[in-house]
Design a protein with these regions (language model features):
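Catalytic cores of alpha/beta
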Residues: 18-30, 65-77, 113, 117-136, ...
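Glycine/Thr-rich beta-alpha phosphate-binding loop at enzyme active sites
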Residues: 73-102
Length: 156
């Protein structure tokens, strides 16, 4: 794909994936990772898609929003787990959700704080709560990425 030829960093297909075909599309397009959203999938279906992606050599970012979903991700052996602080039903965000639930994540997993990032203070707050990575979207669309990216990546 065009993105693959222009990017030297890992690529994530961020979509509401529910079929093997979508995972095959991601692989064919050059993605390195796919997003599986536990709020979108039944646990059995999640495990099937998770295993299928790994069989193709793709990494999986598992998105959670509840403690029950974190438990499912942990039981599957997920090594890249996000806590989405945006409720997909109401679209309300709560930075405190990551702080409340981060300790439930498998200690060996890479912990991803998803959503609610608007300022460098938000990135610092997530980092202090145990996040290894912050997934940023809206802030990059509503602000100047040339300013935000250096600020956000300066948080160690």
């Amino acid at each position: 794909s065009d993105a693959r030829t222009k990017a030297s960093i890992p690529l994530l297909r961020k979509d509401f994936i529910s079929t093997e075909y979508q995972i095959l599309e991601a692989r064919a397009a050059g993605a390195d990772f796919v997003l599986l959203i536990l709020a979108w999938l039944e646990p059995k279906r999640f495990v099937e898609l998770y295993n299928f992606a790994h069989e193709l050599g793709l990494g999986v970012l598992v998105e959670t929003h509840t403690l029950d979903e974190i438990e499912i991700a942990n039981q599957a052996g997920s090594k890249l787990i996000g806590i989405n602080t945006r409720d997909l039903q109401t679209f309300k965000t709560d930075l405190g959700l990551f702080e409340q639930m981060a300790d439930a994540l498998d200690p060996s997993a890479i912990k991803v704080a998803e959503s609610s990032v608007k300022t460098v203070a938000d990135v610092i707050r997530y980092r202090e709560a145990g996040a290894d990575v912050a997934l940023v979207g809206e802030a990059l669309v509503t602000s100047d990425p040339a300013v935000l990216i250096p600020e956000f990546t300066s948080v160690a």
